[in-house]
Amino acid sequence: MPAWSDDKRDDPQPCRDADQGKFETTVRDGRARIGRIHTQHGVLETPALLPVINPNIRTIEPREMWDRYGIQGLITNSYIIWKHDDLKQHAVTKGVHDLLNFPGVVMTDSGTFQSYMYGDVEVGVEEIVEFQRLIGVDIATMLDVFSRPDMTEEEAEKAVQTTIDRSQASLDSAQGVMLNGPIQGGIYRHLRKASAQSMGCFDF
């Protein structure tokens, strides 16, 4: 990551088409890995800290994060963008990078947390992935089912299975866009293991 600077940083160069979506391991230590994810908005070095940006509330402007603090990528919420007409129109016509004024890697969440906080979201499993693709995100996230710490084992198991059941349709809707496959299971270790094993069978 570049040192803090008051100077404007150059925008990143897109990766080669053949490298799009590629994860490259550069250092390995046991099961730990350091690597690079190749995207159309630069190469993201991992592990990476991605600040979360609410498109309606910007404590620090995304462009300042890029220029001054050397942030390579950030996360924003596609459901918030989808739900607000002004944000949605801007993102659809000019892209999410223009909406946020951020040239680096943009990853989006799908509305799962909003579902946890406020009840069911108003968008479909395939629809929200298609929307993320439409607005040009680099890394999208499927609409999974959140596993709360206070869930019973039966409830957590249902969240695991529902997330698995939504996976293939979500991948089909992504049409080549990198897609996260979240792991569920809550406080139950055997469910987290089963979730990871099942989700690992898909092309996330």
Named regions from a protein language model:
Residues 2-8, 161, 170-204:
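Glycine-rich phosphate/ribose-binding loops and adjacent secondary-structure elements
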Residues 2-175:
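Non-catalytic, usually N-terminal nucleic-acid engagement modules in DNA/RNA processing proteins
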